[in-house]
Amino acid sequence: ASDVYKRQPNYISAIFPLKDGVISDHTMTRELICRFVNQVYSSHMVKPRVAVCVPAAITGIESDAVVEAVMAAGARQVYLIDEPIAAALGSGIDITQPDGRMIIDIGGGTTDIAVLSLGGKVKATSVRVAGNHYDEEILKHVRNKYSIAIGQRTAEQLKKNVACCPQKADFNETMEIKGRSLLTGLPIRVNVSTSDLYEPVMMLSEQIG
């Protein structure tokens, strides 16, 4: 989908059924969920029960829209799970203990921050700054600093390989990228380092914090 979106001709319109963690196109979301359900559940005799992860601070209207879309896609029962709880369980964290655990789950459209204890949420919030926003800022930063146009996938690779946050104060990784020079219009290669991306990454991280 990412490759098609980057090279889409004029007669194809790209649609994002989910945006910032919530439904933006109800019809296409239903179609998307239908495909997912059919891939993993082949029985047509009994409708499946479906669990869906949602942002911690999702509104009642937004959660109702999720349930409605999944039911319309063929589910007989829908369970909504807060994304921080799902992230904690997936990481092997025991949230049933009385001591609090802070979970920061940076998704594609939203970042969920929650304090979990005794199997539930003590406090939670969602910030609509997340992975996709990092990609956009890295893309713009490379464009402005190097006069190079890169694609969304290259920006995402820079985020994962160079702009990460390991537990090493002197971390400074470098990655060679290929793009199109805005000055000559020709293909060009440059090396981008962790320190090069400090500004856009910190700007968004401060918004989350």
Name each model feature, range by range.
Residues 2-106, 114-209:
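Nucleotide/phosphate-binding catalytic cleft detector across ATP-hydrolyzing
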Residues 109:
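Conserved Rossmann-like nucleotide-cofactor binding loop
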